[in-house]
């Protein structure tokens, strides 16, 4: 134990184990997805902020979701691309812990916002006359603040739990970025408190959110099926399609990644890493596409922006 340290000066990121020679080529699709995520989510934030007709709870939640996706993808992708293209494998102990916190906390905040959006759909469909009173813009902002505090408080202990561990042997992480489970596996001392708290936090945040989202949609489906006409039922379901797509894009990779981390020890490490990279990029890429395609105001505004840009280019070409 005398040779053990409670911190490493640095950790070494492997990237994709066994495919190090192909890192350069893996960087291009990742950069493309990251660029789409940045562009799409920035557009959503800009349109919701500048279009007064979108200053309603559902779209304010969407703006929050886009901001979270920007932060979540940006917390990892620059380092991943530096690793893949410039072989920048080193990450300091404190930077690793900070990255770990942001990944877990932002995921928890996003989960809370998705729950709030499900509640918005429930009130809008099951209690439409009370929607404006129950969910006004002030309440929406307060919910956003609660989501921020909830995600931060639940996952702030993870870096502190890592700091109490001793690392005696390897400082090599078989991943592209730092997550609690992978850093914990390098520790020499007892990690049971880390395992128990990590699992408890996930169940109390994501587990509870999934349960209440499922309950919301059970009540929504029951209410919609009681509507008299087919067109009314289709219209009511149509208002939920975008949110359902976003929920699936977030929770399906998250659940799959959690199962692989805890029960997939026999799987090739490549599976762990690729699933982790997909989990961080899939929601930020898909969310603005889903809402852009399904929301007329956003779709119209985006098309108008491109039309104005094209008209300016044509005028500039004509003047020359």
From Swiss-Prot:
Extracellular topological segments: 1-24, 75-98, 160-195, 258-272
Example GO biological process: steroid hormone receptor signaling pathway
Tissue: Expressed in brain and liver. Expressed only in some areas of the brain and in the olfactory epithelium.
Disulfide bonds, paired cysteine numbers: 96-178
Residue numbers on the Cytoplasmic membrane side: 46-53, 120-138, 217-236, 294-320
Segments traversing the membrane: 25-45, 54-74, 99-119, 139-159, 196-216, 237-257, 273-293
Residues modified by glycosylation: 5
Gene Ontology CC: early endosome membrane; plasma membrane
Membrane topology value: Multi-pass membrane protein
InterPro entries on file: GPCR_Rhodpsn (IPR000276), GPCR_Rhodpsn_7TM (IPR017452), Olfact_rcpt (IPR000725), OR51/52/56-like (IPR050402)
Statement: the UniProt record of this protein carries the keyword Membrane: yes
Entry's localization field: Cell membrane; Early endosome membrane
UniProt keywords, alphabetically: Cell membrane, Disulfide bond, Endosome, G-protein coupled receptor, Glycoprotein, Membrane, Olfaction, Receptor, Sensory transduction, Transducer, Transmembrane, Transmembrane helix
Record-linked Pfam families: 7tm_4
Gene3D superfamilies: Rhodopsin 7-helix transmembrane proteins (1.20.1070.10)
A GO MF label: olfactory receptor activity
Family annotation (CDD domains): 7tmA_OR51-like (cd15222)
Sequence similarity: Belongs to the G-protein coupled receptor 1 family.
Record function comment: Olfactory receptor. The activity of this receptor is probably mediated by G-proteins which induce elevation of intracellular Ca(2+), cAMP and activation of phosphorylation of the protein kinases PKA and MAPK3/MAPK1. Activation of OR51E2 may affect melanocyte proliferation, differentiation, and melanogenesis and may increase proliferation and migration of primary retinal pigment epithelial (RPE) cells. Activated by the short chain fatty acids (SCFA), acetate and propionate. In response to SCFA, may positively regulate renin secretion and increase blood pressure.
Identification of the protein by name: Olfactory receptor 51E2
Species, as recorded: Rattus norvegicus
